[in-house]
Design a protein with these regions (language model features):
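Post-J-domain flank of DnaJ/Hsp40 co-chaperones
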Residues: 1-106, 134, 141-148, 152, ...
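Charged, often glycine-enriched C-terminal and inter-domain segments
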Residues: 13-36, 98-247
């Protein structure tokens, strides 16, 4: 009996190009509206000199004499239990099935070359920190006819000076005076679109009371609907009262 170990497909190995990951910072205002960003991406693309062949132009590419172009070598050992055959990568051509006389001077025989390009990323409204956007084919190229890898852009939403976020809802801290809390008032609250919304504070409002402004939050990235803006008031009590306030 003959027992065979190792092996795999013969000839050139066709492998998919590597994926790339890059982080992109955006503001909360950009989350609210959606935006497009141009980023610089360094990836390995087919060498423009050899077009991925790895060989110097007009240089001979010969079939490997050790493996006859299969990219694999086979060794057979006789044992008391029978013959054992092992199949492994050809050490001469490293599994390529061919031997290049003169490697490309531009890519040093790798078939790929690093280039930096500008790519436009379309960011939908409502994304969160950690959201991954895939750009097909913008990873590393593959040699031997494989599919190019993809570029994954990981979103990082920067901290905002006024608002905090929970999902699609926004939160805002509003200081009001003791008089406003006692007598009530109508105030303006900033919103993420750069405008202001009116908020009515009823008389007798206690500190840390929250009010909801509907549809003043963020859009959802997958379906229609807008979050709310929650305004928490903090009553500022003066440490000293004027004579007029005492009266």
């Amino acid at each position: 009996d003959l027992f065979v170990f190792g092996g795999g497909s013969s000839g050139q190995r066709v492998e998919r190009g590597s994926d790339l990951v890059q982080t992109l910072n955006i503001t909360l205002e950009e989350v609210a509206t959606g935006t497009s960003k141009e980023i610089s991406v360094t990836h390995r693309k087919l060498c423009p000199t050899c077009n991925g062949s790895k060989a110097e132009p007009n240089s001979a590419v010969n079939t490997c004499s050790q493996c006859n172009g299969s990219g694999q070598v086979r060794q057979v050992q006789n044992t008391p239990l029978g013959q054992f055959a092992t199949v492994s990568e050809c050490p001469t051509c490293h599994g390529e099935g061919k031997v290049i006389e003169n490697k490309c001077h531009d890519c040093l025989g790798s078939g790929l070359k690093k280039i930096t390009e500008k790519i436009t990323i379309n960011i939908p409204a409502g994304v969160e920190t950690g959201t991954k956007l895939r750009v097909t084919g913008e990873g590393d190229d593959s040699v031997n006819g494989g599919v190019s890898g993809d570029l994954y852009v990981t979103i990082n939403v920067l901290k905002h000076d006024l608002f905090t976020r929970n999902g699609q809802d926004l939160y805002y801290e509003l200081p009001i005076s003791y008089v406003q809390a006692c007598l009530g008032d109508q105030v303006e609250v900033p919103t993420i679109d750069g405008k202001n919304a009116k908020l009515t504070i009823p008389a007798g409002t206690q500190t840390e009371t929250s009010f909801k402004l509907r549809n003043e939050g963020l859009k959802h990235v997958k379906w229609s609907g807008v979050g709310n803006l929650y305004v928490k008031v903090h009553v500022v009590v003066p440490k000293q009262l004027s004579e007029k306030q005492k009266d």
